Amino acid sequence: MAIDEKSLEDFGKLRGKIDISRRGFLKNAGVVVAGAAGAAALAGCSSPKTASSDKSEGGSSANASSGASAYAGNEGKTMGEVLGAGWLGEEPEIAASDIAETKTCDIVVCGAGHAGTATARRAAEKGANVIVVETQTEADFAVLGNDIGHLNSSWQTERHGIPSYDVVDFMNEYQICGAGRVEPTLLSDFANRSGEAFDWFIDNFTEEEKAQIVPLNWPVPDGYDYKKGMFHSYVGTANFGEGVSLKDALIRSQDIAKEAGVEFLYETTGVKLVHNDDNTEVTGIICQQGDKYVEIDAKAVVLCCGDIGSNSEMYNAICAENYWLGEFTDCKAMSGRDGSGIAMAMRMGAKVEIGTGGDMGSHAAFPMSPLEACETIWLNKYGKRFCNEGLGGPLMSGCTPARQPGDILYSIWDADWKPMLLNQIAGHLALKYWDDDTINKIDGYMQAAEQAGKDGSDESGKYLYCADTIEELCDYMGMEEGVKKQVVAAVADWNAAIEAGADMKFGRDVNTMYPIIKAPFYGFAGSKRVGGGSLVSTSGLLVTGDQQVQGQGFEPIKGLYACGNTEGGRFPMGYNGIMNGVSIGMCLTLGYTLGEFLATGDLDEATTLGLNNAEPKQSDKGMPGPPPAA
């Protein structure tokens, strides 16, 4: 997701608790890593007694003598009670007499960002009565992002001639990136309908305004191969950096929603869900508006409240991998959202993402050289190659580097770097443009490094080295003699794999590997950046294919839905970067499909159908089941 500096500055003033600019976040980072985020210790999870923990002669147990409490277990508790112990808190007590006003509608949407606006507008266009509540003021409304990733829009295929992609290939590749944990219906809706949703979003644009939207990584270089091993390169993300900004485009969509009858209540914040005693049904939401409370009752409450970026305790708990990779450095994101929408649902028993959780990139590490995250040969602190650098883009192939010893990663390439760079997979943290201006700029960095000799050049903002031999290049980058020998051997093995036509060591498609044989040679040494945060977190509430929030027993909570960064199921193992702008693309598309469903679908089916199904018959001839409960 791209972030324009002005929107980030505005957004930080309004909502942020973290003063980080995009420029400051990326400046001289050298290596983008995973790292800052993860899971808080689970309540009650002290070490259980083992079979050998017999009582001492005095009768006290080993646990007691060591000061540890006996393990009590967490069975029957909600995820909020276990995962949120110590930080989630209780629902606020708001008496009926404190409610100054009550409104009624079909659908109430909490949040007017990309997902919330799409949900409200589409539902209203389909005949629903919709109210949107938004914390920000209307005058100072801000939103993040410049790019909308999608597939097969008429804007792509007809206006720009971008080839249509096979949605079946896309769904399978995306599911691999999510280790099989992506919610399949959400993925299907995006793959099959994101192009439709994008065309709908820009339908109000003039032809001139549509022409100002830039398709990233288009046109592709001559002879470009879209197939990269098991994966494809998805080009054509819509960039709103010129002409109408994405913020202004979103405000236009809000205006269209208002014309369709949607009521927007700005400076209004949802604070408590209205629900029954057993937490199985939501019938409204209580909001704070200035010094008063307003209750909005509806058939459907949709949480589009953003992520958990400024709430480190929640971030640490829900995004476990990032927290662990950062060795328990508190997680923070630039979004500034506080996770209040997710917390509201968790307090009444809702589940969150069941996976490692994640954010936009801090689960992965790679040498972020002047070639961006180019998938050259990657070497660790020992000078050894250690992974398939070309496995589905840097946010997937970068998972292994994040776990390597030390805090240095090296990248090396040779004089014929242009064909390599122009055949990289498109996506997050890769080059966005393959035009002559971009290549000439990078060529200038190479020339500066060649002239700089052993001191290297930081003309690109990152030190780049150039030498006539691999050994000399290693010396310039400050490697020990033993490490230098490993590098020479790794480069020789790399070239041999290309010659043999198979990378038998790590399985990389040799069509994505380029020889390192022609002088001069270039090298980059990056410091592995661990911890500190990311652009935005991408894990939220567990939802069904209809985006209905799930509670105990994985049953959907009647009347409660989530979309955008408040919902899970999209990036359960962290942001995949399969295309630029895929996060906002999902916000738009899934908001579009959710609004349509809420206005026209059967909202009772998920909580009524199947209640009287017969229990499965159990055979005594197969494998025995678990022992009966004590």
Residue ranges and their predicted role:
Residues 1-24, 39:
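N-terminal secretory signal peptides
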Residues 71-74, 190-292, 312-313, 497-520, ...:
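Conserved redox-cofactor binding core of oxidoreductases
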Residues 99-113:
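Beta1/beta-strand and adjacent pyrophosphate-binding region of the FAD-binding site
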Residues 103-105, 291-300:
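Core beta-strand elements of the Rossmann-like FAD/NAD(P) dinucleotide-binding domain
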Residues 125-142:
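Glycine-rich FAD pyrophosphate-binding loop
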Residues 272, 484-574:
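A glycine-rich dinucleotide-binding beta-alpha-beta segment and adjacent secondary-structure elements
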Residues 296-365, 578-580, 584-593:
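Glycine-rich loop(s) and the adjacent beta-strand/alpha-helix scaffold that form part
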Residues 342-344, 351-479:
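An anion/pyrophosphate-binding glycine-rich loop and adjacent beta-alpha core
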